[in-house]
């Protein structure tokens, strides 16, 4: 059903015309589904051709000033000295307990200028709190829209309009023009494919959207709903706060809060980095995992609902957070929160949910392209 949101996409009318009621995500009406294209069609397009998504519900925050680097360095897990202008990095934010509160992409725009893009967690509030007493300017930018063109043909389409796009490396961005509009194109995404995020002004978003879909139709480029990302992220081990977290699946006797060791996100901490919020607790909690994010390879073709129980030898050992069945690979897969002792390749498991009871094995993730060859492809 349609809901009221306090943020508004310039493409809302386009989405409604495609049969979306627009569900609220992070304060913006977002395309959970389209009548015009199914989730299976969107998934197949992005894996085999290309799909275009409106992901403008992501929050964009500009941070500038003499203390901008220090603010980013103290708030996130990345060493900002290694991120030069034109480069970006995936990072996490922790609370003082060393527990995950949000993830983000850090875009370095200049020597003392950044753009932080995050989802529905408390990233903005953390940055605001850490900015107190620092010589920085913070601006929340909802005029800036984010159109994500993802899939193996995305680069072929953009190459017709953007000189040098084939040379843009993974986690790098460029300022350019597209259809006469000023844009920033970033080689990032949330699909496991080679893809690009196109940041443009509110007033230019409809033209960019319409032109890509109009010109790209002959290449198989179609509009894709936001929830297609759930199908893609399961295969590509991409977590989505709070849907894989203890905020959604609480501990019995503890407040919500997962460690990076439990989530498998400890790689986001730059080697040897200290001094960021929650750092001491983060390092202290290594080896004290209460669960592990792990994959499931599931028997049958029915994807269990999120929240389905997982048992091993009659003992509950976890919960499914997100599952999908791929008609391209004929595999049914899931992301799960598993007990540490069962988060081992090949452990036999049973799944009991409202929509299915079946068996599975614990399986390492990533399922699709574990070496990230597609994301790092050149040319």
Language-model features, listed with the residues they occupy:
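Generic hydrophobic, aliphatic-rich segments that mediate packing or membrane embedding
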Residues: 42, 57, 67-72, 89, ...
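Acidic active-site catalytic centers that drive phospho-/nucleotidyl reactions
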Residues: 54, 103, 197
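Conserved, structured C-terminal
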Residues: 1-25, 30-34, 107-379
């Amino acid at each position: 059903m349609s809901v009221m949101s306090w943020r508004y996409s310039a493409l809302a009318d386009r989405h409604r015309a495609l049969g979306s009621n627009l569900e609220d995500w992070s304060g913006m009406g977002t395309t959970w589904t389209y009548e015009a294209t199914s989730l299976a069609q969107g998934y197949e397009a992005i894996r085999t051709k290309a799909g275009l998504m409106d992901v403008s519900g992501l929050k964009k925050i500009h941070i500038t000033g003499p203390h901008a680097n220090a603010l980013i360095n103290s708030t996130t897990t990345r060493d900002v000295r290694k991120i030069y202008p034109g480069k970006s990095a995936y990072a996490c934010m922790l609370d003082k307990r060393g527990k995950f509160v949000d993830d983000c992409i850090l875009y370095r725009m200049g020597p003392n200028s950044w753009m932080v893009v995050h989802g529905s967690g408390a990233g903005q509030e953390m940055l605001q709190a850490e900015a107190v007493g620092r010589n920085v300017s913070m601006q929340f930018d909802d005029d800036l829209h984010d159109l994500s063109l993802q899939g193996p043909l995305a680069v072929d389409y953009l190459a017709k309009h953007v000189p040098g796009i084939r040379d843009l490396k993974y986690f790098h961005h460029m300022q350019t023009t597209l259809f006469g509009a000023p844009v920033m194109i970033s080689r990032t995404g949330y699909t496991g494919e080679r893809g690009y995020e196109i940041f443009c002004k509110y007033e230019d978003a409809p033209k960019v959207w319409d032109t890509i879909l109009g010109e790209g139709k002959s290449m198989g480029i179609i509009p894709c709903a936001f929830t297609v990302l759930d199908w893609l992220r399961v295969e590509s081990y991409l977590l989505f706060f709070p849907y894989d977290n203890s905020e959604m699946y609480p501990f019995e006797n503890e407040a919500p809060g997962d460690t990076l060791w439990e989530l498998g996100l400890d790689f986001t901490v730059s080697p040897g980095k200290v001094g960021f919020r929650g750092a001491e607790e983060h390092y202290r909690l290594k080896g004290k995992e209460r669960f592990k994010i792990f994959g499931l390879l599931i028997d049958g073709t029915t994807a269990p609902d999120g929240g389905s129980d997982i048992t091993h030898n009659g003992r509950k050992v976890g919960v499914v957070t997100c599952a999908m069945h791929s008609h391209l690979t004929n595999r049914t897969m899931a992301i799960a929160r598993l007990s540490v002792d069962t988060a081992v390749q090949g452990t036999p498991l049973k799944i009991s949910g409202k929509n299915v009871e079946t068996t599975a094995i614990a399986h390492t993730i990533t399922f699709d392209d574990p070496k990230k060859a597609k994301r790092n492809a050149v040319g």
